[in-house]
Amino acid sequence: MASWKQAQPSDALARGKWWEIYNDPELNALEEQVSVSNQNLQAAEAQFREARYAVRIARSNLFPTVSATASITNARGSGTMNAPSGGQSTTYDLPVDLSYQADIWGGIQRSVRSSAEAAQASFAQLENARLSYQAELAQDYFELRGTDGERELLETTVKSYQEYLQLTQDRFNNGVASGADVAQAQTQLNTARAQLIDLGVARAQFEHAIAVLTGQAPASLSVSSHPIKITPPPVPVGVPSALLERRPDIAATERQMAAANEQIGIAKVAYYPALSLGLAAGLESTQFLKWISWPSRFWSVGPALAETVFDAGKRRAQVGQAQAAYDATVANYRQTVLTAFQQVEDNLVALRVLEKEAQAEDDAVTAARNALEISTYQYKAGTVNYLSVITEQAILLQDQVQAVNILTRRMSSSVLLIEALGGCWNASQLPTLQDVASGK
């Protein structure tokens, strides 16, 4: 970890648009659609809004509750009771009730803070989902481009094998090659054609995956065909400590930990008495014309103090439950941090190793191409049979495909590294507790 490079100001990526580092307009356009049209992100955004409303609900408990009910009751007493009865009466009521629970011990305030911190965690989870789907799209895109590279390679190979088939056919017609040479060349050509056709399946699957990530029907998207034209650009890594502020999943677990801590305080408040104030006032009359009049008024007001005398250990268990839940969030936070460091280190190593592997594979392709040229020359001179040519052709194609695959893996690893670093996200993007409570 200590070997990470210190990020310089010029290293910074455009905030929120880390994919622009690849300088690919088509990728840029697809990435822009993820935030707008991805249905999983729409669900995560709705969950964040739900969490914000939960904050408002918790905050409403800080204020009195006022209710009013208008009623008209027509009643007749039983004529067989000992008490005077049998008469019929109508009662008109318009009571207004006010109830208020004083937050003496801060339990309601803690509930508001816990809900707000949970909403912050929900926002961080939304941003983590956004980063995850953006990275998934970029990986699918480069896998598709890698498939395009293999297709282009096989198309060139098919043309080359057609020329070799013509060469063996001409030599057979001139009596200097056997029919086996022609059959082998034809088999080699047919195999390459089959491989080329098979790549269409993989390409279609990557195209369908991109369509779904951008909120489209799988068959409705068509991505132009061209191979990867760049090598992985340098990714600004920075210092390990900065990772704690750059990953939204770390921010989410930290906020969950804060919310769980507030729940411990809420559980402890149950040990103290609850003070509430009740007020009832309104108008009541048995005569409609006198209902809305000053003499019909009534009111009652008074405080109430409630304390649990015995609960068989319920409150103690609730505190223990809240403490255990908090301990779980602490462990989850630590594990998330460790996993984040691992992901960064894994992809840094992958990029370094794959770069060396790419250089070695390029040398192998050059050597295989030279070997094929020599075998072809020797075959034309009649010093070797066609099997030697086929062997060198297979080695060259294998090395060329491997070179394309390594480049694809390098691009994918660079995307995974950016994702592991949190993209362009920063903890400063979290909404404040006040903003969450006010719905901004």
Regions found by a protein language model. Name each.
Residues 1-138, 274-279, 312-319:
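Short flexible linkers and secondary-structure junctions
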Residues 1-36, 92, 116, 200-245, ...:
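Terminal intrinsically disordered/low-complexity segments used for targeting and assembly
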Residues 42-43, 59, 102-130, 180, ...:
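Sec/SRP-type N-terminal targeting helices
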Residues 69-75, 99, 125, 147, ...:
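Outer-membrane beta-barrel pore domains and translocons
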Residues 86-90, 295-297, 398:
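Short sequence motifs at beta-strands and strand-loop junctions characteristic
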Residues 92-98, 140, 239, 299-305:
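Hydrophobic, lipid-facing positions within transmembrane beta-strands of outer-membrane proteins
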Residues 108, 124-239, 350, 354, ...:
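Periplasmic alpha-helical coiled-coil/stalk elements that build and connect Gram-negative outer-membrane
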Residues 172-176, 379-383, 420-424:
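A short glycine-centered flexible hinge/capping loop motif at secondary-structure junctions
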